Amino acid sequence: CSWRGHRPDMEKVLTLIAPRGALSPDHLAKAAAALRAAGGEAGAMQPLSEAEAADLPFGGLPLDVADRAVRDALAGQPVDAIAQDVIGRRKRLLIADMDSTMVTSETLDELAGEAGLKEEISAITRRAMNGELDFEGALRERVGMLKGLALEALERTWATTELMPGAEELVATMRAHGARCALVSGGFTFFTGRVAEKLGFHEHHSNTLLHEAGRLTGQVGDPILGRNAKLVTLKRLAGEEGLDLAETLAVGDGANDLDMLGAAGLGVAFKAKPIVAAAARARVDHADLRALLFAQGYRAEAFRRVV
């Protein structure tokens, strides 16, 4: 690896990321001290973005031990820490969830608001995303409750849907460096198509809301894209690109993302449900989606935005 300050014995890197302006020298000092206290070596800090992100090269510790040591040392601070090998940290395939990941809301819950059912449907969504309910059954149940809703409600829901901060930079920067970018969601094509177009994803895969005479029928097209389908899509796209799974990045927040996150080279639980954050190898709880670029070693000045 050619990055500045790299030493052969520092074959791993810890990336510290915080909301803009919130990363302090004290955070970096505590992280380095935690690595040394755990029995590792820490090198010189490499800034990625002023008061937002920095790389800390290290060696002599397994990744999970380093992660845990630094998280414990920074507990209660608004700082995310991601430890990984230096070699191969830049990924060539991005697979991203949509709801509460690429957009700030759960689009089905917002659509339910148009039918006056947001509270009831949100409760089911919450349980499904926490892994308490079967995803497919929960999806059919929620869509069934929307039978008869006019299609104009979809347009109104889209008009108020907001992109997650950092989503534009993530997709545009990875695309500019040759990565294939796919949006894979248990949500619906009406929304994934629009999000994919707005952010510049190469493709999108999701479920279809069936409708007739301008109204929802309360049914979902088969087959349903759920937890296993996300994993299958990750493996299929990696195969099409001739990539090892180690060269892939997946990001999501719900229980139906767990298999995909576990299989990707870097699987990131983004502001995720507790069951997901606990199981994922990497997690982002405080920063925005720019964190996924910093984790790959990109400096802020190299970020792109959708043109």
Regions found by a protein language model. Name each.
Residues G148, E155-V307:
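C-terminal cap/substrate-recognition subdomain and adjoining C-terminal extension
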Residues T15, G40-G60, A83-R89, T101-L209, ...:
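Alpha-helical substrate-recognition element adjacent to the catalytic core
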Residues H6-A96, R304-V307:
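Non-catalytic pre-domain segments flanking phosphatase-related domains
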Residues A32, D67-R71, T125, W158, ...:
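A generic alpha-helix structural signal
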Residues R92-T107, N256, L261:
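Asp-based phosphoryl-transfer active-site loop
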Residues K30, V65, A69, E120-A123, ...:
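Exposed alpha-helical structural elements
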